[in-house]
A protein has these predicted regions:
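PIN-domain endoribonuclease scaffold, especially VapC-family toxins
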Residues: 24-93, 97, 101, 137
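Short, well-structured N-terminal submotif of metal-dependent ribonuclease cores
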Residues: 1-39, 54-59, 121, 130-138
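A residue-level structural signature of the nucleotidyltransferase/glycosyltransferase Rossmann-like core
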Residues: 2, 36, 75, 111, ...
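Short beta-strands and strand-loop turn motifs
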Residues: 8, 79-81, 112-114
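Generic structural signal for short, solvent-exposed loop/turn connectors between secondary structure elements
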Residues: 15, 82-93, 119-126
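Acidic side chains
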Residues: 6, 12, 46, 93-96, ...
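Acidic, metal-binding active-site segment of PIN/NYN-like and related structure-specific nucleases
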Residues: 98-138
Length: 138
């Protein structure tokens, strides 16, 4: 399985937010099940933006961005075609559309997010980290 991990899931772990333990468990289980976890380069950029706004410390921001790189198995680049397709997409949010298209291009099998409503038009199944862990436990 190749799983696209959405930005909000990565931020939960990196900023030790409400779902920190569940996301930690998700990555632990993904490793045990030898699943490939992916994020888009855009997500890594967005993480840097959010962190810099909160931390006001560019060095600390870069270190945490490196942690994000280390957590995932693969960084997915978005193609120019995906960018254009996202503009014409019927998905209202450009970034969500781009995530979905990038996941398809990278042959991901599912999207992992806490904002499932943002991915209602996804051709791929969409799960929270907790739901994915439940699937693995069966």
């Amino acid at each position: 399985m190749r799983l696209l991990v959405d930005t909000n899931v990565l931020l939960e772990l990196l900023l030790k937010r409400e779902h920190f333990e569940n996301v930690f468990n998700f990555f632990y289980q993904a490793n045990i099940h030898k699943e490939q976890t992916c994020a888009t380069a855009m997500s890594i950029r967005d993480i840097g933006y959010v962190l810099n706004k909160q931390l006001h410390d560019p060095k600390k921001t870069r270190l945490i961005q490196l942690q994000a790189y280390e957590m995932i198995s693969k960084v997915i680049n978005t193609s120019a075609d995906a960018a254009i397709e996202s503009i014409y997409s019927d998905v209202n949010d450009y970034e969500d559309s781009l995530q979905m298209i990038a996941a398809e291009e990278a042959m991901c099998t599912a999207i992992i997010t806490y904002n499932k409503k943002d991915f209602e038009k996804s051709k791929l199944p969409v799960y929270t980290p907790e739901e994915m862990c439940e699937i693995w436990s069966k």
